[in-house]
Structure formats: C-alpha cells, structure tokens
Amino acid sequence: MAVFEKVQEIIVEELGKDASEVTLESTFDDLDADSLDLFQVISEIEDAFDIQIEAENDLKTVGDLVAYVEEQAK
C-alpha cells in the first residue's frame, strides 16, 4: 500500500471523513481536525510506519504529512 493510501485510510478512520474528502491538497482545517484529532492521526501514522513525527514540524496539508512520512520511512 502506498504511503498516501495508508495515511488517507488512517485519516478517514480517525476523523470519520469520506475518502474523497482526503486529498493531498486537503488541509487539516478543511477536514475539521482539532489538535486532539491531529494527535490521534499522527499517533496512528507513527505506529503504522514505525517513525516519530516531531511536534515542531509544520504539517498543514495531507500532502505535507505524506511527504514527511516518505522522507522518514527511507
């Protein structure tokens, strides 16, 4: 499974969104994600990819998150 598809799956599950709403261009504001939602999404992604996502990263869109995961998973 590609990184985007797995990230999308986690966001859909954690935020209760339709997969069509979760695109690379979607911001977390667009997805109505508050800080607790984002924490849960990041926690699931860290577990799924066995990486650590630092809090100071400026991840505003799903695409930003996917790019970060791809870089860390290398």
From Swiss-Prot:
It comes from Streptococcus pneumoniae serotype 4 (strain ATCC BAA-334 / TIGR4). Keywords: Cytoplasm, Fatty acid biosynthesis, Fatty acid metabolism, Lipid biosynthesis, Lipid metabolism, Phosphopantetheine, Phosphoprotein. The keyword Lipoprotein does not apply. GO terms for molecular function: acyl binding; acyl carrier activity. Its main location: cytoplasm. Carrier of the growing fatty acid chain in fatty acid biosynthesis. Coiled coil: none annotated. It is found in: Cytoplasm. NCBIfam families: PRK00982.1-2, PRK00982.1-4. Pathway: Lipid metabolism; fatty acid biosynthesis. GO terms for biological process: lipid A biosynthetic process. This is Acyl carrier protein.
